[in-house]
Amino acid sequence: MSEAKQIYHVPVLLNESVDGMNIQPGGIYVDATFGGGGHSKEILSRLDSTAHLYSFDQDEDAEKNIVSDSRFTFVRSNFRYLPNFLRYYGVEGVDAILADLGVSSHHFDDSERGFSFRFEGKLDMRMNKRAGMTAADVVNTYDEERLANIFYLYGELKNSRKLASAIVKARGVKQIVTIGDFLEVIKPLFGREREKKELAKVFQALRIEVNQEMEALKEMLYAATKALKPGGRLVVITYHSLEDRMVKNIMKTGNIEGKAEQDFFGNVQTPFKLVNNKVIVAGNEEVTRNPRSRSAKLRIAEKR
């Protein structure tokens, strides 16, 4: 795999996650979040000539990192459509699925993408640049209650209603188009000592809404449950409590709500058994080298 001219994304918990896939040389594997290709490259290094890796990413920029390898197929699509493409390629079952749910460093550091409050640019935040709705569309068209719900649910912000009210009032004077426009509206609502943390939560909430991240994750997790062979591994790296809760629930109970199904006799039916009872986190050395790994949590489960 050729190195990108600039570092697209430093893979987090690389060895821990790929080890967790329990790779067999001739297996069929899925990297649901290709990004800079770091995890895919490591997976390919452990496969023989009969194996195959299907890697998904909806961002056209990720295509610049793909590898020319007969054992590799790149699918430019959101991982929520995983079953459609596995069916298309005639794949009846896979041996492991890996998903690193973190936003690539590339996205945060590219001012044109609008993911970070550190740079001026358009308020965009689309992972898929061909998708219709931008963050600017959300803040300019959603009603006050809907905005408040987004900030409360996806950003866990206590002042979500004040935020929504300020946005609606400001857009009545002029449209909020750029990150600068947006910061001008919301910055006064936060104390200086917690400003960066609160702004990060606001931007997280908008990003989740724009990209429908929770809905996509839900669909992918249920699809993975069906796609994995018995003994197959589901390996997921999460970065915030909302997605981690969903992943934990699906692995423990087979249901994102955390309610395990029971058979006629009341016996609990769960599709997975946990490989690691406690989450795996980045060590001090990795956190020092890559601070964005600090919030990463790795969970691994095996299909019964």
Curated annotation (Swiss-Prot):
UniProt-listed GO biological process terms: rRNA base methylation
Catalytic activity, EC: 2.1.1.199
GO terms of molecular function: rRNA (cytosine-N4-)-methyltransferase activity
EC category name: transferase
Pfam families: Methyltransf_5 (PF01795)
Primary localization class, coarse: cytoplasm
UniProt binding sites for S-adenosyl-L-methionine: 37-39, 57, 79, 100, 107
Keyword Heme found: no
GO cellular component: cytoplasm
Catalyzed reactions per annotation: cytidine(1402) in 16S rRNA + S-adenosyl-L-methionine = N(4)-methylcytidine(1402) in 16S rRNA + S-adenosyl-L-homocysteine + H(+)
Keyword Membrane attributed: no
Subcellular locations according to the entry: Cytoplasm
Record's keyword terms, sorted: Cytoplasm, Methyltransferase, rRNA processing, S-adenosyl-L-methionine, Transferase
Protein family membership: Belongs to the methyltransferase superfamily. RsmH family.
Protein's job: Specifically methylates the N4 position of cytidine in position 1402 (C1402) of 16S rRNA.
Descriptive protein name: Ribosomal RNA small subunit methyltransferase H
